Amino acid sequence: MEFVTLGTAGGPVPLKHRAQPAHAVIYGKRTILVDCGDGAMGQLMRAGIDFRHVNEIIISHHHFDHIGGLYNCLGINMMLQRKSPLKIYGPPGTSEIIRGLMESCNVPRATGFGIPGQTLPHPNEFVEVYDLLPEHTLNFDDLRISFCENTHYRVEEDFGKPGPISLSMRFDTETRSIVYTGDTGPCEKLEQFSYFADLLVAPLMDAEKIMHKVRTKNPHMSEERLNMMAKHMAKHFLTAGQLGDLANVSKVGHVVAVHIPLDYINQKTVPDYIKQISLKFSGKVTIAEDLDRF
């Protein structure tokens, strides 16, 4: 089983050298797209993966940087006359999003290629969509995928209550375990969920540096708005030290940091962030680039 980091950026701001969040889990002949940020179809092709061979997509949560490529995915498969099922999974609300995107395909489908009598399949003919809860599991041959809620949206005390949820996911085979946390803050449930995983893929955030840049670039932003953003950055993501703590407590083998916003993590600063993680975790640490394979 292999994990490919298709897009390692984070947040809504496009970056020059990192694509929006999307990854691929490859097991045998099966390729599962995990999150589908803007540009995911192109990143698949750059990784040598034919997007037409992707039959499953799993979404961790519904922030735009993780779902911005879904419409393109539907449209390209429609234009290329897809016939095989495309199954899309995600937290509650996923089916509503996909239904809306499929409805918006009506006009481009009717337009087609401008050839009289020519027809295209509608995405509702090949797309199957399923809303997931943390207790659900997916099984594809001997690949088992399990889920747990994380703290990207709310504190653990609110787990199980009505409201939006953000999911982490674990991929288990007989020989390897991979945990993709998606976006999350510190979370005890996630620590337990990640026990003894061979690979832990998780976000890396430096809230202080991000907020400094936000204030510099937006001098007229209200203090209320700035405080709201600062709270989101601090509570709903992981710092280098917190990522090290998660990896240490979970006893994982290898940490891969993704979801890197702005440009403060670069070739010059990567060693420092690896050092911060390694102060808490003695295993292997990698800060991923697009198209890395693990």
Residue spans of the language-model regions?
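Binuclear metal-dependent hydrolase catalytic cores
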Residues: M1-V179, G185, Q192, Q267-F294
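Cap/insert and terminal regions of metallo-dependent hydrolase folds
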Residues: S166, T175-V179, G185-K284, A288-E289
